Amino acid sequence: MVGEETSLRNRLSRSAENPEQDEAQKNLLDTHRNGHITMKQLIAKKRQLAAEAEELKPLFLKEVGCHFDDFVTNLIDKSASLDNGGCALTTFSILEEMKNNHRAKDLRAPPEQGKIFISRRSLLDELFEVDHIRTIYHMFIALLIIFILSTLVVDYIDEGRLVLEFSLLAYAFGQFPIVIWTWWAMFLSTLAIPYFLFQRWAHGYSKSSHPLIYSLIHGAFFLVFQLGILGFIPTYVVLAYTLPPASRFILILEQIRLVMKAHSYVRENVPRVLSAAKEKSSTVPVPTVNQYLYFLFAPTLIYRDSYPRTPTVRWGYVAMQFLQVFGCLFYVYYIFERLCAPLFRNIKQEPFSARVLVLCVFNSILPGVLMLFLSFFAFLHCWLNAFAEMLRFGDRMFYKDWWNSTSYSNYYRTWNVVVHDWLYYYVYKDLLWFFSKRFRPAAMLAVFALSAVVHEYALAVCLSYFYPVLFVLFMFFGMAFNFIVNDSRKRPVWNIMVRASLFLGHGVILCFYSQEWYARQRCPLKNPTFLDYVRPRTWTCRYVF
């Protein structure tokens, strides 16, 4: 965008900077004053001006369009924050509230001011149209080529031959058939059970003589499904079959995603049924199976009956996104092979000390930062855009410009918009609505606590040990920085501080968890107790790892 604005200004001021054109214009004016201008010259001049206008037209329209998109986004954000004189907004949009003005104020007041979906592209798709930004993308590709070449050269020198084995990838994604059938069981149960429970409750609520007890019974069944079936079975499979780390991550992340999806489906539709029952409506607003099925695959955690849709599917774009996901996967593999594995395998035999820890942290910053960028690009951009394109899902704002954040609060809002929306509307705003706006700090604390616990749960199950480094960083340092480095910080120096602290934090995470992984591999216990799973092995292991 910056490059296009500069180009536009340069072209607009080209006539002022070019002395030859100024002289030509002066001669033309002199000729016109003397009455000797010819019709050919006049026509040529008009054609030249028309050509220049046509040349500037696409850039001008594109710039105006970008500013208009920003204006519309800001307008929607502001309109969603209005109290509207005490009247609740609907789940879908302001226009639907005007059309179907039947929501009761006491059902879902503040939380109903929910997310409004509009058709928009992902930010990186727009930025990659600027050559200066796309060059950064090319730099990462060049770095991947260097990693591949260095690995091949080192293997050839050490082994005397080219070693084209991906043992680390094969190990990480092992026992994949178990992952497939477990995922199918999770998906089909999420498709059938919440929909059946909600449909049964919705059709019987208005007919029940004890609607509160009727609702509590169905709510209890739904809670049993969320915690007992969807919450327990995938975790049991992961531990019982001792799946490798990457296979575990697939199941655990899908488990969390489906739990959040099912909650959103019920959370958005229950108030509609309550409102219809209060108005004694003859129709029960129950979504169709197709609407729920589409939502389960859509790249959003906020349920709507319909979303903005694109007119066509660009299958070439889909293939490119999946290709980039696999490229990022191999990128991470080579980072582990070239930067991480040698670092932790070659730690000397010495007691755990501050010196060892500090050296490990600072040596882990570079691979940690690279994996941060790659995970963001692979999942939040490529993976979500691929599914959005296949489903013709119009709203592609899965993230914002988090790299420009000058505060931690802004970073948390822009890094992962998909998860942030769910936490904001279903945890933060629901708590404020249920209790009081005076409990705003408590609601914010609850959001941080839930996010920290879920992140630590995923890591503990996937790595087979409990080492609450991420929980401490997120719950204590992250929350403290959220208040200290807040939205009032606008100067560029704060962006540098946010970036530096985030990079250091990722170095700490990679160092601690990798050290603990290798320590447990090199110092196994014959009969481990429960305390052995939660006590860090790094502090006691004295073997060379």
Swiss-Prot record:
One of its GO terms (biological process) is cholesterol storage. Residues 1-24 are annotated as: Disordered. The modification Phosphoserine is found at S7. Residues 1-133, 202-213, 272-314, 391-438, 486-491 are cytoplasmic. An acyl-CoA binds at N410, R413, N416, H420, Y428, S451. Keywords: Acetylation, Acyltransferase, Cholesterol metabolism, Disulfide bond, Endoplasmic reticulum, Lipid metabolism, Membrane, Phosphoprotein, Steroid metabolism, Sterol metabolism, Transferase, Transmembrane, Transmembrane helix. It catalyses: a sterol + a long-chain fatty acyl-CoA = a long-chain 3-hydroxysterol ester + CoA; cholesterol + an acyl-CoA = a cholesterol ester + CoA; cholesterol + (9Z)-octadecenoyl-CoA = cholesteryl (9Z-octadecenoate) + CoA; cholesterol + hexadecanoyl-CoA = cholesteryl hexadecanoate + CoA. One of its GO terms (molecular function) is cholesterol O-acyltransferase activity. The chain crosses the membrane at residues 134-155, 176-201, 214-239, 248-271, 315-347, 365-390, 439-463, 470-485, 492-523. The keyword Lipoprotein does not apply. Its main location: endoplasmic reticulum. Residues 9-18 have a biased composition (Polar residues). Disulfide bonds join C523-C541. It is a multi-pass membrane protein. It comes from the Eukaryota. Cholesterol binds at H132. It is found in: Endoplasmic reticulum membrane. Residues 156-175, 240-247, 348-364, 464-469, 524-545 are lumenal. The modification N-acetylmethionine is found at M1. A motif (FYXDWWN motif) lies at residues 398-404. May form homo- or heterodimers. Interacts with UBIAD1. Belongs to the membrane-bound acyltransferase family. Sterol o-acyltransferase subfamily. Catalyzes the formation of fatty acid-cholesterol esters, which are less soluble in membranes than cholesterol. Plays a role in lipoprotein assembly and dietary cholesterol absorption. Preferentially utilizes oleoyl-CoA ((9Z)-octadecenoyl-CoA) as substrate: shows a higher activity towards an acyl-CoA substrate with a double bond at the delta-9 position (9Z) than towards saturated acyl-CoA or an unsaturated acyl-CoA with a double bond at the delta-7 (7Z) or delta-11 (11Z) positions. Each protomer consists of 9 transmembrane segments, which enclose a cytosolic tunnel and a transmembrane tunnel that converge at the predicted catalytic site: acyl-CoA enters the active site through the cytosolic tunnel, whereas cholesterol enters from the side through the transmembrane tunnel. This is Sterol O-acyltransferase 1. It comes from Rattus norvegicus. The gene is Soat1.
